[in-house]
Amino acid sequence: MRTLKSLVIVSAALLPFSATAFAADAIQEQPPVPAPVEVAPQYSWAGGYTGLYLGYGWNKAKTSTVGSIKPDDWKAGAFAGWNFQQDQIVYGVEGDAGYSWAKKSKDGLEVKQGFEGSLRARVGYDLNLVMPYLTAGIAGSQIKLNNGLDDESKFRVGWTAGAGLEAKLTDNILGRVEYRYTQYGNKNYDLAGTTVRNKLDTQDIRVGIGYKF
């Protein structure tokens, strides 16, 4: 009986230490709470935009009388469009209008370009802050020929295609660089009784800045 009483007293004395050790083990066995992961916000290209561009063109005007004339030029204008986005695919429509200062003479025949514009489809791939894209559509330009005796100006319609890279500079400001090839086909001009056939091809590099709504 005395032994049993001693055992009860010893067990009661050790009980707080056992509870403390068990609590410590329970605390240590809890898995650590992972730190929250910060996810960068995904930029959306969807919506409307407008902007300005400045470019330089390498042109080739083939004529039936004096051969090829190369009226390289500076050009400037404005663009506007609307994008739709599905996952990482961005697609939409864009138009531009501007002025080309292309003008050059050869053997008495002058070729001069003026207003130019286009209406195109665009498709790009969203890389979050940058978007490479392809574009193609119809183009138009005012092209004038002058042989010193007479001149004639015609609005020419052709096609254009190109590629570019657009980048997000701020939440609403976009920057871009674009290459475009445009062909206006063949057209006859009547200059003082002489028929001059002309074909104009242009290659442009354009840089632009835009505002996304």
UniProtKB/Swiss-Prot annotation:
UniProt entry tagged with the keyword Signal: yes
The organism's place on the tree of life at top rank: Bacteria
Primary subcellular site in the record, as a coarse category: membrane
GO cellular component: cell outer membrane
Key words of the record: Cell outer membrane, Membrane, Signal, Transmembrane, Transmembrane beta strand
Subcellular location: Cell outer membrane
Leader peptide range in chain numbering: 1-23
Pfam families: OMP_b-brl
Family note: Belongs to the Omp25/RopB family.
PANTHER family given in the database record: BLL7405 PROTEIN
UniProt-recorded name of the protein: 25 kDa outer-membrane immunogenic protein
Organism of derivation: Brucella neotomae
